[in-house]
Amino acid sequence: LALASLGLLASASTQAAEDVIEGSEGIVKPLRFSGFATLGLAHNNNATAGAITSFSQLKPVQQGWSANMDTVLGLQLEWQPLSGTTFQVQGVARAGENMQPRLRIAALRQQLGQGLNLNLGRMRSPLFFDSSIAEIGYANLTVRPAPTIYAAVNSVASLDGADLQWRLNLGDASLLAQVFGGRYDYTHRFNNFSPAMSADASLSGLRGFSLSANLQHLTVRVSRTEIDRYALRSEQVSQINSGLNQLSGALRQMALNPLLPPTMLTGLQTKAQGLEALRNPFDNRPVYTSVGLDGNWQQWRLLAELTSMDPHNDLVGRGTGYSLTLARSFGDFTPYLSLAQLKRSSAKLNTSALAPTGLDAQLDGALNQLLQGFDRAQQFANISSRSVSVGLRWDWRENIAIKTQLDLVRTPNTNTPGPLAVPVLPFDNKLRLFSVTLDMVF
């Protein structure tokens, strides 16, 4: 298998993921092999929109049945040559990405002292509460973290850099502080084209922290991540930049006319500067904030998270969201109800520089074409949506769970695609997704 050629896999970067993947026996082994898998089928009732778990997914779940939503295989290898020194490798293949192996972890973990650990290399993403276990179906109570708020951050599956973790045990409670920094590159999919197009996404200057409090029946985590530059490059972006440069050059050439009145001269120069400012329109400097909790009381369990993403880019738009899951166990069976919503809450991109000049019909026609393109891009950049999910988890065997889930997803209107794969607007903005999964760890 292609996955085996990676030399695969290691434990997930958080303690919760380690407990799921590696067990809790605490036995030190020089070489440990383990993994996780989900065999899933999902049915989409919508002919105009596909379902995705991330914006790096190659093959959305279109109308009908598909394994592309949740089917995944993860293998991991951990080598501990010395006490306190561990090498980790983890690879994952997803059906939605043609089962091509992706390296999620390739890191050195070094214990520096009591409760203090340093990780160097590629690690699991720390952006949101469940980011580190999002692909491990068995570790999630539900079939998957709600794409309503997780589709954007699931694209950033890993971090290439370093993190420092300090754990302090206080009786039956503990505190975990984490600081991290690095970069990450991936292929971003624009499903608003038919066929879909790809862009090279590069995140540099990524840094942040998280603080977790683990009590007997409650875990609370707060995190904040800042990214200096989130750049998207593709043939389409290059074409946009080229068109803006040509129009800006034409305006500056017109401004050289000595017969123009000063007010018109200033207006043309300002308009040229405005066009140049629209280059690389998807580049942003996002800040991700998350406050999450996982609590249980007797047979009840509550999962909740508040999230915020401020891209400092009016085309992408700021978003605030939440997810809430309530479950109750009846022996091996756990029915649950989940709610999630993401809402855009920022101003629209200023495209006044694309207004007609009234001086040249050909130039004004080109400006209008770009204006229509930017208006369309703003529509597709709005990932606002809300979802209601009901499901049932059956812990059938040790380390094996079977789940069924019905998701009702809705975007604000027929011209807002949300986190869906929508090639044409307007579209049917209500999607019903039914999923059945078999999750396991080994």
Predicted feature descriptions by range:
Residues N46, I133, Q236-F442:
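Outer-membrane beta-barrel pore domains
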